[in-house]
């Protein structure tokens, strides 16, 4: 069902507001979740549609609505809110709901300067396509809203001046795994990459912040904490201060 209201899509084009399309997105977010109502999310959103409203604004209102409904009696709204956020993220990163190939994502992000180009030197296209077959984008539905929000805000590679995000959580997990095991023997590394991807994307292990945020980027940060020693001289103290500043800028802890 559509009406005369015109909304603005992410690419800047305009289309008639389609209420059924919005309802379909909310229904998908609630699928399989006990104690969650798509109608209640929509009513609680109380969206006041107007000409020129963006699809991004509509989605953000729906996410807030689901998040506001989280309670001790209805905890599963945290998953509905996360799914709505994941939908928004996919639309921003892929331009549509369905994922692009892992190989194309890597090349795009190398061109943007946010992925380390050495990944294409360490792995063949065929190996990257094999890694792509291991990726399970549906695992994004296992996030709670708080968990996915933290990943989006802190760990996904992005342009923080424009808030443009360049990857999704599952691509992030696979890139981390592929980078960490890139120098392993070729006959073994695909096995280890897959196991590490499964362990992280299924939340069986936690990754230190510097590794999660920077290991796949040109920064190539592996260390979580750095011990900085200083002699009792002005030159050494000033040099230590400069080192601390550089490490802190790259998210390393200082000891």
Name the predicted role of every residue range:
Residues 1-255:
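Extended catalytic cores of very large enzyme megasubunits
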